[in-house]
Amino acid sequence: MCGQHYTSIISSITTEASFERVRTHEFIKFSKHKRFDQRHRSMMGQYHSGGEIVSPGTSPFDVLPEDCISNIISFTSPRDACVAASVSKTFESAVSSDCVWDKFLPPEYESLVSRSRVFASKKELYFALCHNPVLIEDGKKSFWLEKASGKRCIMLSSKELWITWGSSPEYWQWISIPESRFNKIAELLDVCWFEIRGKTSARVLSPGTRYSAYIVFKTKDRCPGLGHLPVEVGLGLVGQESSKRFIYFIGPRDRRGRRETRDVTKPDQREDGWMEAELGEFFNEERCDEIEFSVIEIKSPSWKSGLIIQGIEFRPTKSQ
């Protein structure tokens, strides 16, 4: 019922407020702007001298029923919903509605959370899935939501990977460490032929989204025979040619300008204490089926050791 009727109300309000080309959802952007005249500032709430909102005031959109505001906000994003909560007390209340956060949750969310845990609201549940990854598929995958967008993220445990000689205890061992989200992860003991491959269904990821894939790891004793070598990695759709690049697990040993080091991706430190190196990017279209990846170093005759692999992570690519 609120659709076209309240769209015209929003249009008349924004015209009166002298905003040009305001679309229905643009009220969520008001609090981001610092260049408002005094009239707009008084409409949008309380500001300090820097021009940013410190507490919600009133908004011309407060004439709308709260459930209609909630319905409109549910068609935006979690980030925009949080911004909208700063517009006014009415918006703050509307944003807290379960109908808003239900739209941001994955359809199967009930199967992802423990039945023994009770959440006060869908908003609380949403942020729980952002901050506390849950194990799925017999504990071999980890699932969570990107906080700003609600896009799906997953990590495949090293148990889900195909590792050459991975079942041979003289070459690899499976360990449990408290800082891992998985029960067992792979530790490289000693190999010449270092090869890891894997694939996963793209359907567990959000469609219409560009993703980046990362290998998540730790090193021991400077990762002898491997840490300073460029390692070839590949990523792509099954049945198509994969994109190739090179990564380091530590970095080049000689920093005096070897040509090949300029095009090799160096690892980054993560907030959770692990390291990660990017394997590549892909766009997850509606028709995407499976994504495959590889991490290989078989050119050097050196014996390789000192690498602990937690898994392969897929998350939305950050905008540059």
Swiss-Prot record:
SUPFAM superfamilies: F-box domain
F-box domain residues: 58-104
Domain of life: Eukaryota
GO BP term, pick one: embryo development ending in seed dormancy
Pfam families (UniProt xref): F-box, PP2
Transmembrane segments: none
PANTHER family recorded: F-BOX DOMAIN-CONTAINING PROTEIN, F-BOX PROTEIN PP2-B2-RELATED
Identification of the protein by name: F-box protein At2g02240
Naturally occurring in which organism (per UniProt): Arabidopsis thaliana (Mouse-ear cress)
